[in-house]
């Protein structure tokens, strides 16, 4: 049905699903309703739907397709399947490949080590023991740091372990038993590993007591720096374990879901309680979501718990969903109890979840949310830029040059869509390199076109981008260039300018501008990504045998490779080992050691 042909009479008053499409046939939004006629009619009434996202949606919608079903449960399932199929912009869609932060001990090695991993299934096996999931990667790293301080287990890779001939510096720091060179017995190592396992299982009271006594003793002896170190370690343990007792709730396994919406932004928070202990919170920000709260939450619950290894016995929601079959859709054998308590401890837990969602929205989410209203007002942006690409390049005096772009999509950075280009030596300056990157990017049809591109540069880069896109016959892509501060890039940013179509000479925004801060964050992320890729390329190039080193010709190179088998091992050889190579002078060895230092610095 074309929107121009809409009439309530042609829509049946039956349960079903509706798909709203644009002029190209792309599905923008998928909704469900008990009564399709009543629901769809509200979109065409001036006061029918108060959601702020609806004007954006209706402006783009040209066609509405309806699918009839027997009941609301069928509508919910069909809506969920269609959302996964079409990925509409205005619906909530969780990633199906969500993994969890865990720690794992591999049992296949005689001297096991503890690793941070990401996995879809948080289960142990004969080959490895898995602990978690933990709230974040930071929590995993914190635990590893604490384990390293208290349990001197190895941290090196299996390859490094097998080739090491003398203990590393961690042994000297008493943070490793040096099993690589048999400085400890397997029984001693196994005993230390068992203590670490007990720690990861939550038996931390002994360590905490020792730390508290150490803090008290160091303070009495006025060793305040040492006391501070013990105190920080104590806090690390408490923060990493994140097991705060909430005994008053009397729940074994429960999730509490909080929902916070403001303007175009939405945050859903899931508080996880297991065995009566609060393990942490997970936050899910969404932008431009057009679903009603009940539809949003039911869709979220279906997608979220489809990716969970274990479903809790009880799920608390901020309001009743009135979908009787929903628990059985999540787990047929052991359907969870889904309820919305209005009083008591359950209500307190829901309030806590909502407060967490609101706090997340006002801090980390808001700091990265696209300030569309300010963008529309200052840059005269016509349509919401769903996909933004930010470009930068990096090189060292023209060598090892790389160009990159990062992607901001669906109100978040999308690292999986970041791209890198090795810039040819013919691109003799920044503008030529930038032209090459843009030309190669937009000659490819594998990635969707952006609505806006942001450039790390000033007026010249902005002009170059316009010329390149014009040459490629690309229109409708807004170009914004953000100029670095001329005097000191790391200092105040108040002198930075934005260049765009309506401000070809640049506009200077106040440092408090959300729009300026948004572009700065994109620029900084692109710069970080470009530098990291440049360093990897330099490091990789330095490890190639053809890398030119003054004084090292073909004969000496062959002698080195005969001894060390690969150029990478040459870059890891000690001075004493290099001195055994026939024909190498002291100057040659000095050059090789300098090149080694360069590689090490790049890998840091």
UniProtKB/Swiss-Prot annotation:
Intracellular or extracellular location(s): Cytoplasm
Any one GO MF annotation of this record: DNA binding
Principal location class: cytoplasm
A Pfam family annotated for this UniProt entry: UvrC_RNaseH_dom
PROSITE patterns to which the protein is assigned, alphabetical: GIY_YIG (PS50164), UVR (PS50151), UVRC (PS50165)
Domain named GIY-YIG: residues: 13-92
Superkingdom of origin: Bacteria
Keyword Protease: no
GTP-binding found in the keyword field: no
Domain UVR per the UniProt entry, residue ranges: 205-240
GO BP field: nucleotide-excision repair; SOS response
UniProt-listed InterPro entries: GIY-YIG_endonuc, GIY-YIG_endonuc_sf, GIY-YIG_UvrC_Cho, RuvA_2-like, UVR_dom, UVR_dom_sf, UvrABC_protein_C, UvrC
Gene Ontology CC terms: cytoplasm; excinuclease repair complex
Keyword vocabulary terms for this entry: Cytoplasm, DNA damage, DNA excision, DNA repair, Excision nuclease, SOS response
Biological function: The UvrABC repair system catalyzes the recognition and processing of DNA lesions. UvrC both incises the 5' and 3' sides of the lesion. The N-terminal half is responsible for the 3' incision and the C-terminal half is responsible for the 5' incision.
Family: Belongs to the UvrC family.
Quaternary structure (record): Interacts with UvrB in an incision complex.
Name assigned to this protein: UvrABC system protein C
Annotated organism of origin: Chlamydia felis (strain Fe/C-56) (Chlamydophila felis)
Designated gene of the protein: uvrC
């Amino acid at each position: 049905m074309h929107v121009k042909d809409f009439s309530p009479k042609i829509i049946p008053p039956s349960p079903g699903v509706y798909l709203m499409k644009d002029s190209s046939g792309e599905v923008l939004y998928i909704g469900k309703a008990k009564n399709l006629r009543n629901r769809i009619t509200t979109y065409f009434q001036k006061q029918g739907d108060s959601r702020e996202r609806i004007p954006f949606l209706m402006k783009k919608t040209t066609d509405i397709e309806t699918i009839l079903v027997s009941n609301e449960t069928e509508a919910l399932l069909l809506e969920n399947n269609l959302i996964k199929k079409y990925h509409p912009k205005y619906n909530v869609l969780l990633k199906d490949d969500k993994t969890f932060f865990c720690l794992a001990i591999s049992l296949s090695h005689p001297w096991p080590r503890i690793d941070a991993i990401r996995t879809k299934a948080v289960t142990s096996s004969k080959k490895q023991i898995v602990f978690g999931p933990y709230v974040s990667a930071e929590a995993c790293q914190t635990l590893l740091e604490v384990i390293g301080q208290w349990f001197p287990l190895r941290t090196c890779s299996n390859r490094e372990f097998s080739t090491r001939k003398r203990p590393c510096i961690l042994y000297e720091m008493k943070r490793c038993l040096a099993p690589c060179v048999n400085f400890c017995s397997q029984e001693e190592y196994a005993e230390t590993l068992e203590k670490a396992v007990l720690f990861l299982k939550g038996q931390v009271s002994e360590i905490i007591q020792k730390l508290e006594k150490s803090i008290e003793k160091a303070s009495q002896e006025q060793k305040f720096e040492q006391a501070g170190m013990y105190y920080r370690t104590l806090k690390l343990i408490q923060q990493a374990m994140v097991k705060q007792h909430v005994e008053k709730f009397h729940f074994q396994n429960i999730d509490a879901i909080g929902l916070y919406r403001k303007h175009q932004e939405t945050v859903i928070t899931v508080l996880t309680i297991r065995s009566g202990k609060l393990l942490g919170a997970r936050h899910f920000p969404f932008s431009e979501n057009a679903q009603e709260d009940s539809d949003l939450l039911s869709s979220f619950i279906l997608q979220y718990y489809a990716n969970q290894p274990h479903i809790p016995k009880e799920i608390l929601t901020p309001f009743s969903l009135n979908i009787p079959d929903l628990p059985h859709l999540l787990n047929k054998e052991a359907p969870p109890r889904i309820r919305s308590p209005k009083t008591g401890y359950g209500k307190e837990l829901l309030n806590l979840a909502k407060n967490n969602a609101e706090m997340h929205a006002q801090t980390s989410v808001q700091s990265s949310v696209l300030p569309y209203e300010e963008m529309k007002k200052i840059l005269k942006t016509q349509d919401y830029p769903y996909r933004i690409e930010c470009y930068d390049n990096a090189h060292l005096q023209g060598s090892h040059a790389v160009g990159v772009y990062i992607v901001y999509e669906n109100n978040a950075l999308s690292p999986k869509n970041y791209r890198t280009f090795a810039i040819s030596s013919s691109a003799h300056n920044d503008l030529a390199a930038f032209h090459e990157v843009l030309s190669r990017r937009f000659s490819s049809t594998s990635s969707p076109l952006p609505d806006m591109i942001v450039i790390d540069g000033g007026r010249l880069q902005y002009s170059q981008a316009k010329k390149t896109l014009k040459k490629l016959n690309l229109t409708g892509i807004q170009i914004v260039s953000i100029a670095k501060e001329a005097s000191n890039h790391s200092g105040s940013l108040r002198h930075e300018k934005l260049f765009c179509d309506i401000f070809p000479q640049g506009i200077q925004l106040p440092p408090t501008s959300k729009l300026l801060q948004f572009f700065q964050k994109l620029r900084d992320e692109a710069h970080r990504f470009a530098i990291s890729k440049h360093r990897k390329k330099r490091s990789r190039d330095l490890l190639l045998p053809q890398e030119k080193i003054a004084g090292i010709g073909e004969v000496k190179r062959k002698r080195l490779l005969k001894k060390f088998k690969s150029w990478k091992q040459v870059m890891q050889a000690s001075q004493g080992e290099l001195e055994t190579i026939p024909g190498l002078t002291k100057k040659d060895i000095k050059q090789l050691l300098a090149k080694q230092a360069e590689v090490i610095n790049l890998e840091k």
